[in-house]
Design a protein with these regions (language model features):
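Short amphipathic alpha-helix that is part of the acyltransferase structural core
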Residues: 1-30
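Short, solvent-exposed polar/charged micro-motifs at secondary-structure junctions
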Residues: 15-18, 46, 125, 147-149
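Short, flexible, glycine/charge-rich loop motifs used to bind or transfer phosphoryl groups or to couple energy/partner
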Residues: 24-26, 48, 72-73
């Protein structure tokens, strides 16, 4: 991981290929903060300079569920944020937990971070647990109605 760097992405459009093309949901969530995993040993050619390759993103934003902000009570509702996208180009060993842990360290404080593992996609939340998230259980089973182009 010595060749990797995690830094905030200021141009949200830079993450679009990850969110819209690679991630299974194919849609943008609410994004307040987004961090990129850059491989300093692999470069993408720009017209003038060589830039480290962006190989993953981790984004945080307001939850689609308004009730989530109240998990810590009225007093702390503005501190709650959801880790809503974790996308890797290659998904090599330890990249996910490295990106999550380094992204969490860069978030403005204080924050209460919540994330969900989509069991319908065979995600078990192991990356989050490896990043010291506290497992609090599963949500109620639900049925998602898919409209055209995979949107809810």
């Amino acid at each position: 991981m010595n060749n990797y760097e995690v830094r905030q992405i200021r141009n949200l459009g830079e993450a679009d290929p990850f969110i819209l093309d690679i991630h299974y949901a194919k849609r943008k969530p609410s994004i307040s903060y987004i961090y990129g995993l850059f491989d300093n040993d692999s470069y993408e050619e720009d017209r003038i300079i060589m830039i480290p390759e962006l190989i993953g993103i981790c984004s945080f934003g307001m939850s689609a569920s308004p009730n989530l902000s109240y998990i810590a009570g009225e007093k702390h509702k503005n501190k709650v944020i959801e880790l809503n996208r974790l996308v890797l180009k290659y998904n090599r060993k330890n990249e996910a937990s490295f990106l999550v842990s380094k992204s969490l360290k860069q978030l403005p404080r204080p924050k209460i971070v919540v994330s969900y593992a989509d069991t319908a996609q065979d995600h078990l939340g192991i990356v989050y647990q490896a990043s010291n998230f506290m497992f609090t259980g599963t949500t109620k089973e639900r049925t998602d109605m898919a409209a055209c182009k995979g949107k809810h």
